[in-house]
Regions:
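Beta-lactam-recognizing serine transpeptidase/beta-lactamase-like catalytic domain environment
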Residues: 1-4, 12-213
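Short, conserved phosphate/pyrophosphate- and ester-handling motifs at nucleotide-, phospho-/glycolipid
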Residues: 7
C-alpha cells in the first residue's frame, strides 16, 4: 500500500471535481465512526489530540487522515479511481527496464468481481489515505508525484530515452496549493521532520501504511 503518499492524488481529484475549493476547511474530530467501525486520524490514535479546523495545505502537511476520509467521500470512489488512473496508477509506466508490473486501483466493480462483496464507504476511506486494496509500485508513485512537481505534466519514466509527456489539464492553482502543502510537510510543524533544516528547501509527503503480513 502506498499510504499517505497517495493523498496528493486525492487532493487533485477533490479539487478538480469541484467538491472542494482552495478555501475548504474541515474540523478534525479525531475519529469518524460509521455504525460499529471507527476511522481515526494518526494524531488522535497516537496522542489523543485533534488538529482543529484545517484547510488543504495544512491537511497535507500534517497528513490528516480524517480530512482525506471526508474529501474522499465527497469525491466518490468512481472519480477517485478516474483520477488515480489519470496519474498512471493501475497500469505499467513502460519504463525501459525489464520486469515491471502494475499496481491495483480497486473499484466497486473490481471488489464484486474478485471478492463477490459490495463496496462500503469504509473502502472509500481506505483508498483516500492510500490503504485498503490499493497497491502501487514505487515507479508509479514516482511518476505521479513528478507530475505534480512539473506542474501537471505526466511523463513516462525513462532511463536511456526521452520521456513522453502529456499535459493533465490540472489547474495551476490546484497544483500550487498541493505543492505548498508538501513544502509545509517538510517544514517545522509538518510530518517530514528529517527535512526541517534541510537546504535547499524541498517538498515532500510522508507515508506510513498498515498491511497484514
Amino acid at each position: 500500500h502506498p499510504g499517505s503518499v497517495f493523498k496528493p492524488v486525492v487532493a487533485v481529484a477533490a479539487l478538480s471535481e469541484g467538491v472542494i475549493d482552495e478555501n475548504y476547511t474541515f474540523n478534525d474530530p479525531g475519529v469518524i465512526t460509521i455504525d460499529k467501525y471507527s476511522y481515526s486520524n494518526w494524531y488522535f490514535t497516537q496522542y489523543g489530540s485533534t488538529e482543529g479546523t484545517i484547510g488543504l495545505t495544512r491537511a497535507i502537511a500534517r497528513s490528516t487522515d480524517t480530512f482525506f476520509y471526508k474529501i474522499g467521500e465527497l469525491t466518490g470512489i468512481d472519480d477517485l479511481v478516474k483520477w488515480a488512473k489519470k496519474f498512471g496508477f493501475d497500469k505499467e509506466t513502460k519504463i525501459d527496464l525489464p520486469g515491471e508490473i502494475s499496481g491495483l486501483v480497486p473499484s466497486p466493480e473490481w471488489k464484486k468481481r474478485v471478492k463477490n462483496e459490495i463496496w462500503f464507504l469504509g473502502n472509500t476511506y481506505h483508498v483516500s489515505i492510500g490503504q485498503g486494496d490499493l497497491s502501487v509500485t514505487p515507479i508509479e508513485e514516482n511518476q505521479a508525484i513528478s507530475a505534480i512537481a512539473s506542474g501537471g505534466e505526466l511523463c513516462s519514466p525513462k532511463i536511456a530515452a526521452e520521456p513522453k509527456c502529456k499535459n493533465m489539464d490540472i489547474k495551476k492553482d490546484y497544483i500550487e496549493i498541493i505543492k505548498e502543502g508538501m513544502i509545509d510537510a517538510c517544514s517545522t510543524g509538518g510530518t517530514g521532520y528529517t527535512f526541517f533544516d534541510f537546504t535547499p528547501q524541498v517538498a515532500c509527503k510522508t507515508g506510513t501504511a498498515e498491511t497484514n503480513v
